[in-house]
Amino acid sequence: LDIRRQRQMCIRDSIRTVWESDEIEDLRPDQQRLAWLVYDGFARNGAMLEGEARERYAAINQELAELHTRYGNNVLADEEGYVTYLSEDQLSGLPEAFAAAAAAAAADRGREGEYAITNTRSSMDPFLTFSDERELREQVWRTYYSRGDNGDEHDNNALIPRILELRNERVQLLGYDNYAAWRLENRMAKEPGRVFEFLEAVWAASTARVAEEVADMQAIADAEGAGITIEPWDYRYYAEKVRQAKYDLDSDEVKQYLQLDNLIAAMHFVAGELFQFHFSQITDGSVPVWHEDVTVWEVTNRNTGEHVGVWYLDPFARPGKRSGAWATTYRSHETYDGLKTTLGSNNSNFIKGAPGEPVLISWDDAETLFHEFGHALHYLSSNVAYPRLNGGVRDYTELQSQLMERWLQTDEVIDNYLVHVDTGEPIPDELVAKIRNAATFNQGFETTEYTASAIMDMKYHTMDPSDLDV
C-alpha cells in the first residue's frame, strides 16, 4: 500500500511539473490540451491533497463507490421484482402488438396466459398511454415511480442523504462550498446561481404550458363523462386523446410504420451518406457478445474499405439490464501507441415481440434511437492521437445526438424506410404532415418533468445535507 501511494504521488508530482513547465508551450495544441486535462483531473479529484485530508478523501471515495452500487442495484431489483400481471379482460385499449409482447414477457416469467407489464419505462409508457383501465394505470404509475422507495430491503431513502453528505464533504476538502460549485466550475454555467436562474426561467414557461395541456385533457375527460380530475397516471392517456383531437394523429397508427429493423437500416444509410460509413453484420460468431440479443457490426469506410471500428446493438429489455437508452464505448480511437479503433455500442430497452413478429416502436422511441446513434457516430468519427481527447466537452456532448434526431424526419429516410408492417406501403404524406405538425405537442409536460429533476438535483447539491429528509 505504501509503495502504491508513493507511486501515485510521484505521478502526481510529474504531472504538475509538466503542466507548470515553460516547455509546455513547445508541445502541439492537442498535447497541451491533454496535459491540462490530466493535471486538472488530478487536482479536481484530490490528488494534490496531503496527509489526513488525502486519507479522508480516499475513504470517502471508497464509501461512495459502495453506496452508488447499492443504489443502482436497489433500483434494478425493484424493476425486476415489481411486475403487474393482467388478465385478458384487462387489455382494453392496448395495441395488439403491445399485448403480444406483454404475453411473451409473462410467459418468460412462467405466467402463461397472462400479460406482464414490467417495471421499466419501455413497458410503463405505452401502458399509461393506451390502457382504458384507470385503476391499473394508477398501479403501474405508482409502481414505476416508487422504485427504491418501498420501505423494504431495496429502499434507497437512507442512502440518499449519506451520498449527499459524502459528496459535500469531499468537495469541501478541495475548498469548494458545495458539490454543485465543484461540478460546474469547468462547465459553461460556471456557478450554481446561473443554473438556478436558467432553470427558474424555463420552469415558469413550462409549467404555464402544462396548465394549458391539463386543461385540454380535463375538457376531454369531462366531455366523456369520466367524472375525474386529471392525475399523473391519467396524463399520458389523455394526452394521446388530445393529440388525436387536435392533430388527428394516432400514435399507434404511426407505430405501424416504425419497424425496428427498418430504422436500424435507416440509421446505417444516414451514416453512409454523412460519414461514408458502411455497416456489415458479423454473424459467424467470431466476435463474442454478452447476450444472444446483441448483434455486432463491422464499420468500414465505404470508399476505401478501411476498418473504422465495431458497433454493437443491444436493443431489448431483459432482467438485470438497467432501463433507458444509452451509448457507450469499450475502446476509444487512438494512434499514439499504435492504431486502436473504436469498439462502441447502442443500448435500448424495447419490448421484444413474440417469436417471428416484427418489433414496432413509437415515434418518440425512434427519435431516441437516432439520438443515441448520434453518440455512436461521434465515437466512430474520432480521429485523435490520445484516447483522453475523445468525446469532447461535457456541455457540448448532446449536440451531435440532437442533430442526428433530425434525420429521422428527412424525406430520404421517410420515403425509403417507413413502410407499413403488413402491407409494405410507404407512410402516407398526410400522416407525415400530421407528425410534423404535432412535433411540439406535449412539450410542456416533457420540459417540466426534466426541469423538475434538474432543480431537485441542484437543490440537493447546494443545501446542507445533514438534516435532509427525503
Indicate residue ranges for each PLM-predicted region.
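Single conserved hydrophobic/aromatic residue that forms the stacking wall/gate
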Residues: D2-R7, I11
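Extended, charged alpha-helical coiled-coil/arm scaffolds that mediate oligomerization and mechanical coupling
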Residues: E25-D26, D30-H68, V75
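Active-site-proximal, well-structured secondary-structure segments within enzyme catalytic domains
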Residues: D30, L34-W36, E63-T69, N73-T118, ...
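A conserved hydrophobic secondary-structure block that centers on an alpha-helix together
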Residues: L37, G46-I60, R147-W182
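Active-site recognition of the HExxH zinc-binding catalytic motif
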Residues: N168, W363-L380, S401
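Catalytic Zn2+-binding segment of zinc metalloproteases
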Residues: Y176-D177, G374-P387
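Short pre-active-site segment immediately N-terminal to the catalytic Zn-binding motif
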Residues: F350-F370
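The catalytic-center signature of Zn2+-dependent metalloproteases
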Residues: S382-Q409
